[in-house]
From Swiss-Prot:
Transmembrane segments: none annotated. GO terms for cellular component: plasma membrane. It catalyses: ATP + H2O + aliphatic sulfonate-[sulfonate-binding protein]Side 1 = ADP + phosphate + aliphatic sulfonateSide 2 + [sulfonate-binding protein]Side 1. The complex is composed of two ATP-binding proteins (SsuB), two transmembrane proteins (SsuC) and a solute-binding protein (SsuA). This is Aliphatic sulfonates import ATP-binding protein SsuB 1. InterPro entries: AAA+_ATPase (IPR003593), ABC_transporter-like_ATP-bd (IPR003439), ABC_transporter-like_CS (IPR017871), ABC_transporter_ATP-bind (IPR050166), P-loop_NTPase (IPR027417). The keyword Membrane applies. GO terms for molecular function: ATP binding; ATP hydrolysis activity. Part of the ABC transporter complex SsuABC involved in aliphatic sulfonates import. Responsible for energy coupling to the transport system. It is a peripheral membrane protein.
């Protein structure tokens, strides 16, 4: 069995007395891709913030076995006064690893844009920068909160394929929040369905397909029907 990188247990998480997460027990294994699928307000993003260490007011624990954790947000959140290279390297001077940044720029398909400012980038290009920035610290786990929701369908598919290539190349574990059933099934080794508040994991759906996957694969269609059934049974759609 692959080595466990993180063990996440959330017994209880509340905001202003309202319980948003309850009874979460999740382990992330080395090299796997896991998606959290559910409706708005079920606590997916809150769970991701707990895993990242950005939210610490909860009852439970997050045990990180090894490696760093990085976060890619829904919006790229690039600093407008910094170049692409500087945004990736978290610095406005030469203190960042220029060789590593140059490699990441090439890997995400932005060769020639190292000195460009964010205002010169399309939405898809800006999100490529955000992904490269997430990889800069050589993380073992990359957390992504609906990273492709703001781009068009064709760009989304290209970014999904890019993410799979990068995860395989750098042997990174991914934990992804999404509302998109097709995206979850195309990317993931496991899809975790979350129910309405208080949010908890109601079903785990393994995806037994090798990558790269054919989006037209009949098995994906059958898995989508199963995922939608699980969402209906959890009273979330």
């Amino acid at each position: 069995m692959p080595e466990s990188l993180m063990d996440i247990r959330v017994e209880h998480k509340a905001f202003a007395g309202n319980t948003v997460l309850h009874g979460i027990d999740l382990s992330l294994q080395s090299g796997e891709i896991v998606s959290l699928l559910g409706p708005s307000g079920c606590g997916k993003s809150t769970l991701l913030r707990i895993v990242a260490g950005l939210e610490q007011d909860f009852r439970g624990s997050v045990q990180r076995i090894q490696g760093e954790v990085a976060f890619v947000f829904q919006e790229p959140r690039l600093m407008p006064w910094l170049t692409v290279a500087q945004n990736i390297g978290f610095s406005d001077d030469d203190r960042y690893d220029r060789r590593w940044v140059a490699q990441l720029i090439e890997e995400v398909g932005l060769s020639g844009f190292a000195d460009a400012l964010p205002k010169a980038l399309s939405g898809g290009m800006a999100q490529r920068v955000a992904i490269a920035r997430g990889l800069y610290s050589h993380p073992a786990v990359l957390l992504l909160d609906e990273p492709f929701s703001a781009v068009d369908a064709f760009t989304r598919m290209k970014l999904q394929d890019l993410l799979l290539q990068l995860a395989a190349r750098h042997a990174i574990t991914l934990l992804l929040v999404t509302h998109d059933v097709d995206e979850a099934l195309y990317l993931s080794d496991r899809v975790l369905v979350m129910g309405s508040r208080p949010g908890t994991i109601t079903h785990q759906l393994p995806v037994g397909l090798q990558t790269p996957r054919d989006r037209r694969d009949p098995l994906l269609a059958r898995l989508k029907a199963q995922a939608l059934t699980e969402l209906q049974q959890a009273h979330v759609i």
